[in-house]
């Protein structure tokens, strides 16, 4: 009997708020390098979802498609603006994939929660705890300031790291390595190379 490997699914929640304008080029370049590395990786396929968010909209750009079909970011399709409804973006995105198992959920933001209307931190924490405990999800939170660390802790995400906005390329290289580890072993780690 051949044992079927589990399907790998990465959900990437990317901040597209106004404060990301200062690192827009590095964010685009870093994301595109991450995408290239994951498309070239040998082995099992990777189901990928990308959600971009700001206070004007939460855009589900890709939902559970093969990563090889994901297009690069550029100046026309990544346009930072508005405020940071972080909890709404996280809560709604988790609910989108509520029945999926073994999801690797990555949050990249340079700011902290300042505009959510639907979700509070406590509700997001309950969702995260349920997904980790009952569905095998893993969460990685990458934030650029002290406030974002508080945000990660307030919703129970233990694996959180500081993003250096002046070196987004290195951040995405570490994310790519974490995704590769997830694809290879079903587990994640994140090495802060500083």
How would you describe each model-predicted region?
Residues 1-194:
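Acidic, low-complexity intrinsically disordered regions
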